[in-house]
């Protein structure tokens, strides 16, 4: 969009890059610290380091694809459990972010589900307008789907995708499932599969 691309790096960074790279002879900023600047190298416009700036601990890998709607970029941070699959290093770190697409600054964030993360959070945000109400859907690491007002992050609703008596057991032995797929909206209906 507008000659830029947004992606999540393997270092848990949300990156905005110039699709021309340095072929256009310009170092578009505000990020100007590229190590390599030849015509075959990438030109980063801004970089949001979710690991160091917000304390996100991506379990396995930060994996979502950013969603751009209007002036905002929505991402799920992949905040999750440690290698032992039990402790959550930073349950207060944001799980969901809305970022200004021009500056890379966080507009709003949510740390839901905090200490209820089962494993990790790897899905991609979804945008829809159920009942004519614009909303962005985030897939919580607790098996809940969260709906937020896109501009200010007000929680509109949330829904547990598991039976109330379900139990989480690592290794797929339990009846509680986390969310790995991405929701699809058609009209006022949201479709989403869960599994462990």
List the model feature ranges, each with a label.
Residues 1-196:
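Noncatalytic, solvent-exposed loop/strand surfaces
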């Amino acid at each position: 969009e507008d000659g830029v691309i947004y992606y999540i790096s393997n270092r848990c960074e949300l990156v905005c890059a110039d699709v021309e790279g340095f072929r256009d002879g310009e170092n578009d900023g505000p990020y100007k610290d590229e190590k390599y600047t030849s015509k075959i190298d990438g030109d980063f416009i801004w970089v949001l380091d979710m690991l160091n700036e917000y304390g996100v601990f991506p379990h396995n890998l930060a994996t979502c694809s950013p969603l751009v709607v209007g002036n905002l970029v929505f991402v799920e941070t992949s905040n999750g459990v440690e290698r032992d699959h039990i402790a959550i290093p930073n349950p207060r770190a944001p799980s969901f972010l809305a970022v200004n697409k021009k500056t890379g600054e966080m507009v709003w964030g949510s740390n839901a589900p905090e200490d209820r993360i089962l494993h990790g959070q790897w899905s991609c945000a979804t945008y829809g307008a159920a009942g004519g109400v614009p909303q962005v859907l985030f897939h919580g690491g607790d098996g809940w789907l969260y709906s937020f007002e896109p501009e200010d992050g007000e929680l509109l609703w949330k829904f547990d995708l598991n039976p109330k008596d379900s139990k989480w057991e690592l290794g797929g032995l339990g009846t509680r499932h986390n969310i790995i797929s991405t929701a699809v909206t058609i009209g006022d209906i949201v479709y989403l599969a869960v599994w462990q």
